[in-house]
Design a protein with these regions (language model features):
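Conserved beta-strand-loop-alpha-helix hinge in the C-terminal portion
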Residues: 74, 82-100
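ABC family nucleotide-binding domain
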Residues: 1-71, 77
Length: 100
């Protein structure tokens, strides 16, 4: 398949696979679910969860979807380019448990 023939979710999974191929210490994901429907977004987040769990990669996820924060170990919220809040999640949720 050519890239244009892949769905948005497939393109995101390929992008994650390319990023993970070199076994990075840090995986920076800028809006990985931004252009996806919620079902496909959950699949992409599950892939990121699996990479984080199995490879021990530090995953930094940037998003405008505040609901995704519930699956993070640590959340840093920005407001007007400044750190507004930092907190840890005592009860993390799995990607399938998130509210969109």
């Amino acid at each position: 398949h050519f890239p244009a023939q892949l769905s948005g979710g497939e393109q995101q999974r390929v992008a994650i696979a390319r990023a993970v191929a070199k076994n990075p210490a840090v995986l920076l994901c800028d809006e990985p679910t931004g252009a996806l429907d919620s079902a496909t977004g959950v699949v992409v987040l599950e892939v990121l969860e699996k990479v984080n769990r199995e490879l021990g990669t530090l995953t930094v996820l940037i998003t405008h979807n505040a609901g995704i924060a519930d699956m993070a170990d640590r959340v840093i919220r920005l407001s007007d380019g400044q750190i507004a809040e930092i907190h840890s999640n005592a009860a993390k949720k799995a990607a399938r448990e998130l509210s969109w």
